[in-house]
UniProtKB/Swiss-Prot annotation:
Designated name of the protein: Holliday junction branch migration complex subunit RuvA
Gene: ruvA
Lineage summary: Bacteria, Pseudomonadati, Pseudomonadota, Betaproteobacteria, Nitrosomonadales
Gene Ontology terms, MF aspect: ATP binding; four-way junction DNA binding; four-way junction helicase activity
Region span, Domain II: 65-140
Keyword Cell inner membrane appears in the UniProt entry: no
Family of the protein in this entry: Belongs to the RuvA family.
InterPro entries per UniProt: DNA_helicase_Holl-junc_RuvA_I, Hlx-hairpin-Hlx_DNA-bd_motif, NA-bd_OB-fold, RuvA, RuvA_2-like, RuvA_C, RuvA_C_sf
Length: 194
């Protein structure tokens, strides 16, 4: 298994890059999110890789971050999502955006990606739903996720509300709210919505 490659970037032709590692050139498919972060040709690059082996093909996929690679691996475990579709998903959405789409169960966002229809988007959301941590997403989004927000989010999730409902409730909270007041405001909001 090839888990990481460090070498000189020789060629960039989306979605393919060529990385020279001590005289051996590795062709690596990368999502556009990684492609846009690559250094100039001739510069040193490190990619976290996934070696894809099937009967008729051996491919190397590269990612700028371990999170992208881990998400790619999760995506390709889903029925109907192959390596190319997984790459397309990561090219169309950042890791954070995809996590937010899963937490909020936003299939419309996913259907905008070429090759993802409504049924595939719904299956993807269903299978990833339990694998995504909403508290981590709140932090990733940089949404000024204070400890108060995290505590309110955790409490609402523990009460059985889904990620989409909780996100909507958190958006309507007033600034500087305490945990107990935030939970009360959120519960009032959620009782009106249902």
């Amino acid at each position: 298994m090839i888990g990481r490659i460090t070498g000189l970037l020789l060629e960039k032709h989306p979605p393919l890059v060529l990385v020279d590692v001590q005289g051996t050139g590795y062709e690596i498919d990368v999502p556009m999110s990684t492609f846009c972060k690559l250094p100039d040709i001739g510069k040193k690059v490190t990619l976290h890789t996934h070696f894809w082996v099937r009967e008729d093909v051996h491919l190397l996929f590269g990612f700028m971050t371990e999170q992208e690679r881990a998400l790619f691996r999760q995506l390709t475990k889903i029925s109907g999502i192959g390596a190319r579709t997984g790459l397309a998903i990561l090219s169309g959405l950042s890791v954070t955006d995809l996590h937010q789409a899963v937490v909020s169960q936003d299939s419309i966002r996913l259907t905008k990606i070429p090759g993802i229809g409504k049924k595939t988007a719904e299956r993807l959301l269903l299978e990833l739903r339990d694998k995504i941590d909403p508290v981590a997403i709140l932090s990733e989004a940089g949404a000024a996720a204070s400890n108060v927000d995290k505590d309110i989010l955790s409490a609402l999730l523990a009460l059985g509300y889904n990620g989409r409902e909780v996100n909507r409730a958190l958006e309507q909270l007033s600034e500087g709210v305490t945990v107990s007041d935030g939970i009360m405001q959120s519960l009032k909001f959620l009782s009106k919505v249902k």
